[in-house]
Each structure stands twice: as C-alpha cells, then as structure tokens.
C-alpha cells in the first residue's frame, strides 16, 4: 500500500528516531442502534467490536485504531483492530519496523515489562512507557517529563486525524469501513507531509 511506502520514506527522513504511540476508537454506530444497523448485522461476533473509552466512561461499537506518529505528527504505522482489543494487543499487531535506537513513547496502558525488554534486546527499540504510581520500575523526573512531552504530541495528532473523519463513516461492509479508515489516515499523512 502507498501509505507504507510513504511511511518508510518518512522513517528514513526522521533522523531523531522519536515516535509516539496511542490508540483511538472509531465507532460504527451508537450503542442504541447496534441492532438496527446494517453494517453490524454482517459482523459475526458483535462482542469483539464493543469497546470502552475509559476516559469518557462510555462504551462504543466499532474499531480501535493504533497509530504511531513521528514528532512532527506524521503517522507512520497503524493497525485497525476490533473495539474490545486492549492497547497491548494493538501493539502486538503493529509491524514496529524502525531503525535501531528508536524511541517510542506510549501511555501507561502499554505497561508490559516483558514487551519493553524484548523490544530493547531484540529490535533495539526503546519503548518509553509512562509509569503508573505503583510501577515496579520508577523513572527519574527528567525522563518522566520527556515521556510526557512525547506522549502529548500524539494526542494532538489524534485530534487532527479525527477532524479529518466525517461525523459518520458510511460503509456497507466491515472491510469497506476499515478501508475508509485507512484512506482517511493516508489522506491525513499526505496533507500533513506535503500540504501543511
């Protein structure tokens, strides 16, 4: 796909090798309309697509998009998963094709020490996860601020990507819905790289 070819070019041009990782939900319909929606009738296991937005204390029916962006807010990798998937499951689905020594900042939902150690040992990628208060691995204050700075960048990007999406994505099949999400991300990537 052209998105991935452009992404590899952007990764090569990103000399800082600093990235941010986060996910955002894309609802197919409101919860109240699940039984009447034509698209949801074609989804076999509906519970896989029922997710929760913890920050808003709200459930949704749709997909969750995992996105990795550069410091300049260019998306370079993404994965579209059912809404019930956790952030760690999304991390497992990403290709993580980055240069050695790359740093990927993520929020506390990606806390998994085995993943951090594996990526550092095998791929030489440093996964910078924001630590919870009860974490076994404690960060220095400077590292905590650095992770927060990198993490806030992706929140801005996700807001900009969601502005690209229409209020409702019209699709008749699940594959068409996912294709439209991928095309919106590609359009955002082109807009961010060449127009803005």
Tell what function each PLM region has.
Residues 1-196:
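Short alpha-helical elements
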